[in-house]
């Protein structure tokens, strides 16, 4: 397993466990997170305010169907299912593009489709 693959797996595992510290440990201090046409945040502190959302209950079910690595770019494709506190379920497919720097995630671009 490459260092980049290990970091991306730790990042995904942090979301599965709703472990904010584990997620943040995978990021550079100046990380950029983009969801095209919807959202962009810069910096680890800002990133932290958008993870482990209080509007959900329990742990999300995250399945990674495919991982692709090339140089310092890593792509993960999969699905997420999570229960909301209002009783509804969020179900989406994702494609996350990770730009890596010095063994950490420097930029994340997330493409999300609600099912």
Regions found by a protein language model. Give the residues of each.
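Short, low-complexity N-terminal intrinsically disordered segments enriched in polar/charged residues
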Residues: 1-29
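A beta-strand edge to alpha-helix "cap/lid" segment located at domain peripheries
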Residues: 3, 16, 34, 48-115
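Short glycine-rich loop/turn motifs that provide flexible caps or phosphate-binding loops at active sites
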Residues: 13, 42, 86
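Short amphipathic alpha-helical segments, especially helix-boundary/capping motifs
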Residues: 23-28, 41, 56, 70-74
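A short gly/proline-enriched turn/hairpin at secondary-structure junctions
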Residues: 32-41
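Short beta-edge strand/loop motif at the mouth of beta-sheet-based domains
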Residues: 40-49
């Amino acid at each position: 397993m490459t260092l980049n693959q290990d970091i991306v797996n730790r990042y995904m595992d942090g979301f599965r466990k709703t472990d904010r510290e584990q997620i943040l440990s995978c990021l550079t201090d100046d990380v950029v997170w983009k969801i095209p046409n919807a959202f962009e945040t810069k910096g680890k502190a800002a990133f932290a305010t958008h993870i482990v959302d209080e509007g959900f209950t329990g742990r999300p079910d995250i399945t990674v169907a495919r991982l692709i690595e090339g140089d310092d770019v890593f792509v993960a494709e999969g699905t997420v299912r999570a229960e909301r506190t209002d009783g509804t379920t969020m179900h989406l497919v994702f494609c996350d593009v990770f730009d890596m720097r010095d063994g950490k995630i420097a930029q994340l671009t997330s493409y999300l489709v609600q099912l």
